[in-house]
């Protein structure tokens, strides 16, 4: 085999403990994410609260520890008071971000109840677009204060005796974007976020706050946005956010799978900018990152534009319903590997989104729920990627791409679970033409054996799943990894996602 990669692992060579919240996700009041997604009263799978239990089971399978809510662009014109209290008294509103009609049938308290069903925390975003400090404080009081005040007592009146105790709060969403309702300049947002953070911490000093970073690395204000806004917020927030979506717009699969290298560069630039502000402020505090929107998103763009421009003000129209193919799953796997590589600084991340909207889970309003191709790498990472991210020493063959020069055939990371005495290697062979032999030195893991080698591969890079047929799914291929004398030798088939588990 002419293509080779080599990796040296040692349980003492550590990047960081992985914060399980990097396997978070996102539900926005957009398209069919909420209505006909997680919530569809009258559906055969719905419980007494209208929550689809087939969806609940799939979300539980992904084991998502935190879910961002309610947006997204939606939050910048969100009046949280409309989403609580008796459902029959809640107003219908024009939803400006996606030009839909929001009926507020599902709101803050209902979503919190659903999040408990799927064993997730809520990451709550506040509206810093059309609203500001006082409304953010009122919402926090409603959610987290026990009782005896206007908004905590209002929550109790609404049937929720115990506070929600939401710990993570996003200070707005994508405020650098001119598409955002209430878009701000760097200085405007920095000052507003600083004062909002200071006020919110007076109400609940235990919360964690996320300052808005750049909407993507191609924004003209990147990375000045981070440097300027953090000069205001650095002492008062815990994270700065990152958002990035990728797509195979040129239909060049070889170059498409190099886009995880762009993600790596994006993270490194944000880290450098945060550390510049740290140095400038002579601070001892290190700013961590919340990559709270990431995914593949491009398939549905034309259909979405048609709905917003020509068919507005619908309730839950089918928007952003990308149907993912096999190569999309490979890139999602590569993006997960990239997040794990930066576990020392990326402490939260949200696959955007979770159900129906650029999502791993899809529903049929008249039928069942099903797994998209991207479901599987996320499930594997969430299941086996908990523990300590190891710092691998890697070398190997490369191949040429159109826009990214030469890239490595194999991208990989390993996670050591000390409690279970296991190490899991995640590897993508992004060479579309040839298999690669991966040799991994695991001599520090004495007495280990091959537990399993899971693989996802398909001759058709454009293969998709549907309600009636799963063309892309993982299989066991244990014969592809041999462990002898502390050296694991694995065959990584061309264009494949691999999960290699070693343990005692």
Name the predicted role of every residue range.
Residues 1-225, 231-239, 263-264, 268-302, ...:
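Non-catalytic accessory regions flanking glycosidase/transglycosidase catalytic cores in CAZymes
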Residues 243-259:
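Active-site His/acidic residue clusters
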């Amino acid at each position: 085999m002419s293509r080779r990669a080599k990796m040296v692992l040692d349980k003492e060579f550590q990047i960081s403990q992985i914060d399980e919240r990097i396997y978070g996700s996102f539900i926005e009041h957009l398209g069919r994410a909420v209505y006909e997604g997680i919530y569809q009263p009258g559906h055969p799978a719905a419980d007494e609260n209208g929550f689809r239990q087939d969806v609940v089971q799939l979300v539980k399978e992904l084991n998502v520890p935190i879910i961002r809510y309610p947006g997204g662009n939606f939050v910048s014109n969100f009046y949280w008071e409309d989403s609580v209290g008796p459902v029959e008294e809640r107003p219908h509103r024009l939803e400006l971000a996606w030009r839909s009609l929001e009926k507020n049938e599902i709101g803050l308290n209902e979503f919190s109840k659903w999040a408990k069903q799927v064993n997730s925390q809520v990451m709550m975003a506040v509206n810093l677009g059309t609203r500001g400090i006082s409304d953010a404080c009122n919402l926090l009081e409603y959610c987290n204060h026990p009782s005896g005040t206007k908004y905590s007592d209002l929550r109790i009146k609404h049937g929720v005796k115990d506070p929600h105790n939401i710990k993570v709060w996003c200070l707005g969403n994508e405020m650098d974007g001119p598409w955002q309702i209430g878009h701000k300049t760097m200085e405007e947002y920095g000052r507003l976020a600083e004062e909002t953070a200071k006020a919110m911490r007076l109400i609940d000093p235990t919360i964690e706050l996320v300052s808005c970073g750049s909407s993507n690395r191609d924004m003209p204000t990147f990375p000045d946005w981070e440097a300027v806004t953090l000069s205001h917020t650095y002492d008062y927030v815990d994270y700065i956010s990152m958002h990035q979506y990728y797509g195979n717009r040129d239909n060049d699969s070889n170059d498409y799978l190099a886009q995880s290298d762009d993600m790596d560069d994006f993270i490194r630039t944000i880290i450098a900018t945060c550390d510049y502000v740290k140095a400038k402020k002579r601070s001892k505090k290190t700013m961590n990152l919340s990559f709270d929107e990431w995914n593949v998103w491009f398939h549905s763009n034309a259909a979405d534009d048609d709905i917003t421009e020509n068919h507005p003000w619908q309730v839950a129209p089918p928007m952003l319903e990308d149907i993912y193919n096999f190569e999309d799953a490979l890139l999602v796997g590569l993006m997960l590997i990239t997040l794990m590589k930066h576990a020392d600084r990326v402490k939260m991340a949200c696959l955007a989104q979770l159900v129906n909207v650029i999502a791993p889970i899809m529903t049929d309003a008249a039928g069942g729920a099903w797994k998209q191709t991207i479901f599987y790498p996320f499930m594997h990472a969430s299941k086996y990627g908990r523990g300590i991210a190891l710092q691998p020493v890697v070398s190997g063959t490369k191949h040429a791409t159109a826009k990214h020069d030469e890239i490595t055939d194999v991208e990989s990371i390993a996670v050591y679970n000390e409690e279970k005495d296991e190490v899991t290697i995640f590897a993508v062979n992004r060479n579309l033409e040839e298999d690669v032999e991966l040799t991994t030195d695991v001599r520090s893991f004495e007495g280990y054996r091959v537990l399993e080698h899971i693989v996802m591969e398909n001759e058709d890079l454009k293969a998709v799943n549907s309600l009636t047929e799963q063309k892309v799914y993982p299989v066991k291929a244990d014969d592809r990894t041999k462990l002898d004398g502390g050296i694991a030798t694995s065959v990584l088939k061309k264009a494949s996602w691999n999960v290699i588990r070693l343990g005692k």
